[in-house]
Amino acid sequence: MADADLHALPALLGADDPALYTIHQPQGASPFLLLADHAGQQVPRALAGLGLPQAELDRHIGWDIGIAGTTRALAERLDAWAIEQTYSRLLIDCNRPLASPTLIPEVSDHTVVPANVGLSTAQRQQRIDAIHAPYHARIDAELDARRDAGRATLLVMMHSFTPVMNGMQRPWQAGVLYHQDTRFAHALLQALRDEGDLVVGDNEPYSVSSTSDYAVPVHGEGRGLVHVELEIRQDLIADAAGQQAWAERLARIFSALQPQLLALA
């Protein structure tokens, strides 16, 4: 792809578009650091909703329903640095490697995304340069600063999942996801199951791999950090009361696990 092809495109983000991400608790003292890659559902004005009605962007395909409020509330309780990505995962999925076929999906849960069909190499690169790359650069900058300051980091990737997928009801209230490093995952899985009122998935409803995921392989395993990916079922955090309840539960569990996890760091 020639640079001229990329420069010839109209700007993706305009002055009226929202910021790429929001940082919560920027001076947070906690060792926990929270990432919410799918928190937002915004679309640049130039792309006119990706050609979709708002009702589609409001579905689970457009964002991780409820995870923004849950992450904010948890960050406040823990005094933990957190980043919330603003734009819809249908625009570009910030938890996908650049080579992933679902980085910019043409179809998601049976919905065709018109603005994603037949993208040129330059259009694809424009979204990477405007959204994916600077978002992860900000995370890298924070992790670098903590490393250089000698601060331990316990990394949590915050996600939510739809209760029903392809007609199948999902029984889990939460899922603990991991790839090769199980230090945080196994401790959290046990702690959540010890709550007594939860069905918790072990690498369910999804599993993590280096070809399907970005944050765990790159920010977690790539840096050798103690890390976990947490999934919460969306109907449980669809409103403020559910988000606050889960934030309170997780803050209590994370605080109890902190000494054990820091000893592993």
Report residues per predicted region:
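N-terminal catalytic or cofactor-binding beta/alpha core of small enzyme domains
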Residues: 2-155, 160-265
